């Protein structure tokens, strides 16, 4: 089923979902943030059909989230690396993970957890204002501005 394009929508969330909202795309970005770079490794991790993975990677490259690069081991293979634009999705992936940890697992159920390498402890993503104060949705106002 085709969906309406949000490429000209004034809402940044709608435009973002138009680019990365297909769920395989975010899982590819998640794996790339975890160090996966080769097509076969993405396929193994995600269990995706080659054509679906190929389509997702192509779209991520076209929109500048990933790029094809020479293999890091010097072989003839091509790898996929996150661009700066792609690396900036890190807090989005962490926030989705955090929400899932809080709401989608039963007590005592096993799950993967991401820890801060320096401290070995879990961490939280929070929205803060310029003073470092934590904000909630009730603290926000939506206005239209020109870019």
Name these PLM-found stretches:
Residues 16, 26, 63, 93-103:
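Alpha-helical linker/hinge and terminal dimerization helices associated
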Residues 34, 84-85, 117:
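Structured loop/turn residues at secondary-structure junctions
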Residues 94, 98-147:
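C-terminal regulatory/oligomerization modules of transcriptional regulators
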Residues 1-8:
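A detector for short, charged/polar N-terminal pre-domain segments
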Residues 11-52:
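N-terminal helix-turn-helix DNA-binding core of bacterial DNA-binding proteins
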Residues 39, 43-71, 75:
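Canonical helix-turn-helix DNA-binding module
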Residues 21, 72-93:
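Basic, amphipathic "hinge/linker" alpha-helix immediately C-terminal to the N-terminal HTH DNA-binding motif
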């Amino acid at each position: 089923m085709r969906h309406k394009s949000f490429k000209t929508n004034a809402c940044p969330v709608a435009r973002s979902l138009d680019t990365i909202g297909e769920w395989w795309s975010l899982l590819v970005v998640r794996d790339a943030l975890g160090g996966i770079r080769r097509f076969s490794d993405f396929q193994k991790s995600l269990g995706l059909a080659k054509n679906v993975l190929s389509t997702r990677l192509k779209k991520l490259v076209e929109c500048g989230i990933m790029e094809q690069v020479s293999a890091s081991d010097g072989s003839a293979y091509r790898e996929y690396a996150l661009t700066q634009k792609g690396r900036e999705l890190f807090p989005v992936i962490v926030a989705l993970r955090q929400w899932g940890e809080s709401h989608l697992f039963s007590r005592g159920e096993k799950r993967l957890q991401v820890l801060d390498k320096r401290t070995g402890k879990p961490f939280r993503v929070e929205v803060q204002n310029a003073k470092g104060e934590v904000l909630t949705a009730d603290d926000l106002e939506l206005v239209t501005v020109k870019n």
